[in-house]
Amino acid sequence: MNATIRRGSVHDAEAVAGLHALSWRTAYVGIVPEQALGDGLSEERRALWELRLAAEYGEPANTPELLIAEQAGSAVGFAYLVPQADGRILLDNLHVEPGRTGGGIGRALLGAARSHVARQHPGADLYLEVLCDNTRAVAFYEREGGLRTAEQEGFFPGGFVLPEYEYTWTAADRDQSTS
């Protein structure tokens, strides 16, 4: 893998937005409506990440965390963790640059996310939502020990509603695997 995982900052907004749009345009073809992946996607993702990373979030325990995977000084993947009101931590994004998938970067980011949650939010479950038809991601999360805990409708930018699964890594399972 040879990637370094580090904390992200507002200075990563452009790189993260570019990775996010590129990942969607690769992984979501045939899954989401074409217009959701069109010309405005890059600018929409850039605005989203500039807002997310520049915002004042308040208490440290409630602050989202951006993790960046780098190779040769360039961002090649990222994960974004968001504490939720119910005490769980949402892994809101986990993306790896297309062409680098399958090389351990996603596994390293997920591992770093789980470690961050264990350190900063002891006792909290980590969960994510993934489009049901994103079979490559679904298979990855199942290989990585995620438990399918829900099937629901997900709201995608542009007003699209698509079926998604929720996968959870419980604090209890994490604690057993580290003891």
Protein language model annotation of sequence segments:
Residues 3, 7-11, 17-99, 107-121, ...:
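Acetyl-CoA-dependent GNAT
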Residues 76, 103-105, 145, 158:
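Short glycine-rich loop/turn motifs that provide flexible caps or phosphate-binding loops at active sites
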Residues 88, 123-138, 143-179:
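C-terminal "cap" of GNAT-fold acetyltransferases
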Residues 97-99, 103, 132-133:
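Active-site acidic-Proline motif in GNAT/NAT acetyltransferases
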